[in-house]
């Protein structure tokens, strides 16, 4: 079973992430940041990952530390659940539309952290959520999961739709990349023999 639980405690946040990469999309989310919970729900449902996230952070200041640290802890949990990466497909991509918005996400479990985030948001906030925090979430994930991640919003007018298509596409790309390939069972998906 590809499951993991990671706890991260700092002076700013206390985070717990538990996941099952081979789940059905069940989720239990309580980050204290409602829009982040909504986006994590997209990852769980579209990635078919069972996901529990509990977070307590200094949201009286703002949501930055909570959002970033949830990304970090989720990245650590995914890396732990995958383990040595034997048999995974490694690469995943997805295009997801939502009305006028369309986003593309491509991921590589390369072991080389890298983020290309190109989302021309049409406004700075979605409700009380600062859209710039989405970059911090994905940067935290990338650096701790050891992945290369390309995120492109190709079109969109509604910022909520823009970001929701990003998170849905991320969930679907993640699902494809961590899927086990029976034909490559026990093999590292690299000509180097390691990732």
From Swiss-Prot:
Compartment(s) where it occurs, according to its Swiss-Prot or TrEMBL record: Cytoplasm
Catalytic activities: D-erythro-1-(imidazol-4-yl)glycerol 3-phosphate = 3-(imidazol-4-yl)-2-oxopropyl phosphate + H2O
Designated name of the protein: Imidazoleglycerol-phosphate dehydratase
Alphabetical keyword list: Amino-acid biosynthesis, Cytoplasm, Histidine biosynthesis, Lyase
Pfam families: IGPD
Record-stated family: Belongs to the imidazoleglycerol-phosphate dehydratase family.
CDD domains: IGPD (cd07914)
Classification via InterPro entries: IGPD_sf, ImidazoleglycerolP_deHydtase, ImidazoleglycerP_deHydtase_CS, Ribosomal_Su5_D2-typ_SF
UniProt pathway annotation: Amino-acid biosynthesis; L-histidine biosynthesis; L-histidine from 5-phospho-alpha-D-ribose 1-diphosphate: step 6/9
UniProt organism field: Burkholderia ambifaria (strain MC40-6)
HAMAP family given in the database record: HisB (MF_00076)
GO cellular component, one term: cytoplasm
NCBIfam families hit by this protein: PRK00951.1-1, PRK00951.1-5, PRK00951.2-1, PRK00951.2-4
Gene: hisB
Gene Ontology biological-process entries: L-histidine biosynthetic process
Transmembrane annotation, as ranges: none
EC number, as in UniProt: 4.2.1.19
Lineage: Bacteria, Pseudomonadati, Pseudomonadota, Betaproteobacteria, Burkholderiales
GO molecular function, one term: imidazoleglycerol-phosphate dehydratase activity
